[in-house]
Amino acid sequence: MKDLQLVLFVLGAIAIIAVLVHGFWSIRKQQPKSMKQSPMAGFYKDQAKRRDSEGFDADGIGQVRVRKPGEVEETVIKPVLKTNLSQKPHSGTTKLTDTPLQDSLRQPGPHKTEPEHVEPKVVQPAQQSLFVGDDVKPAPTASTSMNTPKKIFNPSTSTAKLESYTGKPVAARPEPIKPPIQPAAPKVDVKAEVEEVKAEVEVKSTLKADAPVNEPVEPTDVLVLHIFAKAGEQIQGAELLPSLLSLNFKFGDMDIFHRHIDNAGTGKVLFSLANMLKPGIFDPDNMEQFVTQGVVLFMTLPGYGDPLMNFTIMLNSAYQIAEDLGAELLDGQRQPWSDATKKDYLRRLNAA
């Protein structure tokens, strides 16, 4: 048993040593080689030692030299190949001339003369001279033309002279068209117009004052419809408000809802809706907490527009509200709505 433990201990030590050796070897293998160990190190050293005849290496860097004060550097003069660029290359074919070759070589080159300074002369066209003078004269130079006064162009005389020179009729030049003289606008008497306007305004104001003023007529009758919650139930404000808005009711005067002639909530009031419980008002900001036993719709007679049409709208609105809230429609006496009640309301409408 002890021999087995010793063998295992030796094998384990050998395995650990092998792993360590392999690790060091792999780490050393992965490290980059330095320039000294690179196979190209000798080549770079030889290239650095090589220099040309002037003492410069492959990169154009010379040796470091120390100069003494007063020492003059010797300049190296390189031979330069000079060529005569003025000579033209000889062509492949040569021309035979009567003069011998030596004479042609002895002849001096063409003498270069400086160009003479020529004064520019300004020459006027011949056609222009026909319009200016009677006879055709030579064009003056620039110096004389600056001093001589210019003649004014006369279309009548120049046209006749042009016909005499050319022998052909020349079309007459169109004369400039003068704009028609507009008659002066008559002066407007502003004061008179202002007085006339004032007089018209005064007449209209007097007519309005004489016209009878439509005083508000006192109502002679009121048509009432009740919407009452069923037994054991209440009308919730959160359900009532959307129904009223869908029927174009608008919250307004006396803190109640009104139905106007315009669906946008403007114009005359056709009928109104109030709370059945006192004080009969609504709070639109707290409609979610609002509860009531019922609401009442009422329309005064006489009213604006056709009373029969207005009552029809009110009756249809009452039917819709009762259907939306699951409530009952009652008449003014809080009795169920019936055909007899409807006939009675129509009679009251006709009497109004």
UniProtKB/Swiss-Prot annotation:
Polar residues biased stretches: 83-105, 141-160
GO biological process: division septum assembly; FtsZ-dependent cytokinesis
Swiss-Prot/TrEMBL keywords: Cell cycle, Cell division, Cell inner membrane, Cell membrane, Membrane, Transmembrane, Transmembrane helix
Example of a GO cellular component annotation carried by this entry: plasma membrane
Membrane topology summary: Single-pass type I membrane protein
Parts of the chain that traverse the membrane: 7-27
Cytoplasmic side: 28-352
Stretches with biased composition (Basic and acidic residues): 111-120
InterPro entries registered for this protein in UniProt: Cell_div_ZipA, ZipA_FtsZ-bd_C, ZipA_FtsZ-bd_C_sf
Residue intervals on the Periplasmic side: 1-6
Subunit structure: Interacts with FtsZ via their C-terminal domains.
NCBIfam families: septum_zipA
Task performed by this protein: Essential cell division protein that stabilizes the FtsZ protofilaments by cross-linking them and that serves as a cytoplasmic membrane anchor for the Z ring. Also required for the recruitment to the septal ring of downstream cell division proteins.
Family per similarity comment: Belongs to the ZipA family.
Protein name: Cell division protein ZipA
Gene of this entry: zipA
